[in-house]
A protein has these predicted regions:
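Macromolecular interaction modules
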Residues: 1-248
Length: 248
């Protein structure tokens, strides 16, 4: 089973929070377990947690606004909104559980954005430990251009990038506005690539540059804005069936 939407919860941890890194590690340990309590619910298929990394990597572009992402793959947006209302078995009605009393001071810049999964591309077996996330807006003036861009990205560009060593799979995402959103929705499109390490993705882009290929093949580059590339370490991941087995 594959979900049709992602709910991405984005947050930073206050640098002034008591306990420093030890306290942040405790929050991460709790959040990893907490995510599984949602993923075990009907309509959820997968969950990941990621942490921004390699900020000074030469392949990074722009400034990513959040250190942590919690990603939930669901069949429909209403599934996630309903789960928020229900809470979890261990913390009904309190989304942050034992951290509820601290969340306003400890967890900063909290946002929640929903994305429609436009396509998935499975290139290789195996698992990468990092994600390269390409985020951007693009000015497409009519439905024909939208369709042309969609075809290019899905059937040409993404398979080409995934053909490089160390890149296993990828997802294309588009913001899906919903009343359950929190904060700025930011860029309309994301390309998420599961990779061995940040160099895997950066080397793919460098090879294209060395062969004289511009970003977005030069076809769409002048229409692109708010372009960002950020790298994230995958902290944890769990599928629906595994999450259920852990509970029982």
């Amino acid at each position: 089973m594959i979900g049709n939407y992602w709910s991405i919860v984005k947050a930073n941890i206050s640098p002034d929070a008591p306990g420093g890194q030890d306290r942040e590690d405790e929050l991460n340990e709790w959040w990893n377990d907490h995510q599984g309590e949602y993923v075990e619910k009907d309509g959820f298929t997968y969950g990941w947690r990621t942490r921004l990394t390699a900020l000074d990597h030469p392949g990074a572009i722009g400034t990513a606004p959040h250190k942590y992402h919690a990603i939930y793959e669901v069949d429909k947006i209403a599934t996630f909104n309903r789960a928020l209302e229900e809470g979890t078995i261990s913390n009904p009605g309190e989304p942050w559980g034992p951290w509820q009393a601290y969340v306003d001071d400890y967890v900063l810049d909290w946002e929640r954005t929903y994305y429609k999964v436009l396509t998935r591309h499975e290139a290789k077996q195996g698992k990468g430990k990092f994600w390269a996330c390409v985020k951007f807006d693009i000015d497409l003036s009519n439905p024909e251009q939208e369709a042309e861009f969609d075809n290019w990205y899905t059937n040409i560009h993404m398979p080409e990038i995934c053909g490089y060593a160390g890149i296993y799979r990828a997802w294309r995402l588009e913001v899906a506005p919903d009343d359950g959103d929190l904060g700025d929705r930011r860029q309309r499109f994301w390309g998420v690539y599961e990779v061995d390490n940040p160099d895997s993705f950066a080397n793919a882009r460098l090879d294209r540059t060395n062969r004289g290929i511009q970003p977005f093949d030069g076809i769409w580059l002048t229409r692109v804005s708010n372009f960002e590339i950020a790298f994230y370490q995958v902290l944890s991941e769990v599928d629906h069936e595994t999450a259920k087995r852990r509970r029982f």
